[in-house]
Amino acid sequence: MAEISAKQVKELRETTGAGMMDCKKALQENQGDMTKAIEWLRQKGITSAEKKSGRQTAEGLVESYIHTGGRIGVLVEVNCETDFVARREEFKELVRNVAMQIAACPNVEYIQGSDIPEAVVAKEKEIEMGRDDLGNKPDNIKEKIVQGRIEKRIKELCLLDQPYIRDQNVTVEELIKQTIAQLGENIQVRRFTRFVLGEGIEKQEVDFAREVAEQAGQLAPEAESTTETADATSETTTEKSSAKKKKKK
């Protein structure tokens, strides 16, 4: 993969208006060729998406998705600019796919990296700095490793950074940008909630061995009672038989 300089990224960003990470990826995918990188961004719909990113989104849809078996459920709100686009089948399909994506991603808690509180990032850094495999490494190397791990962890937590479940070569963010280019309006995921059946409920542990033993203990008295009943019945029958013999005499 070609080495991409900050100057190249800046130049492509100024030309297309795309984000820095998108520009860097475009250049990497095209071995630093500026013309091909611009075409790549246009094909992905990223340049037009960036131009529309500041426009207000007040319309849209709230979509629900229940996974097979009813054990996982999702509610997600995706906004667009007009009611006309909200009624378009392409927009509805996007919202359904985003809901399914959330259902398939148990680690996702935020929409994008900027939504993550500083306290969460600081806690992640504290955890990584304390790992045993970093103990003997110089501080400057340790810092780079920790930073890389934190960036990876942040991506795991963010919806927009997830590989799209139907095409692993595209992220959810890129999928949305493609739809923006197609429909000509700004589109944003505003909020979502993921439900898991029984989540947060402490389940009572069952001691099956003890349960079987208790059942066996309950059966014993019943067996004794049955034996006593049988003995009593036998004694009654014997007494009746003796009485009949006395009458015959």
From Swiss-Prot:
Record's Gene Ontology CC terms?
Answer: cytoplasm
Q: Give one Pfam hit by family name.
A: EF_TS
**One MF annotation (Gene Ontology) recorded for this entry:** translation elongation factor activity
Question: Region Involved in Mg(2+) ion dislocation from EF-Tu: which residues?
Answer: 82-85
| Localization terms from the record | Cytoplasm
**Region (Disordered) residue spans:** 215-249
Q: Which UniProt keywords apply?
A: Cytoplasm, Elongation factor, Protein biosynthesis
PROSITE patterns in the record:
EF_TS_1, EF_TS_2
Point to the regions of Low complexity compositional bias. Answer: 222-236
Spell out the NCBIfam families in the cross-references: tsf (TIGR00116)
Entry's family note? Belongs to the EF-Ts family.
Q: What does this protein do?
A: Associates with the EF-Tu.GDP complex and induces the exchange of GDP to GTP. It remains bound to the aminoacyl-tRNA.EF-Tu.GTP complex up to the GTP hydrolysis stage on the ribosome.
State the protein's name: Elongation factor Ts
Task: Kindly list the organism's lineage.
Answer: Bacteria, Bacillati, Cyanobacteriota, Cyanophyceae, Oscillatoriophycideae
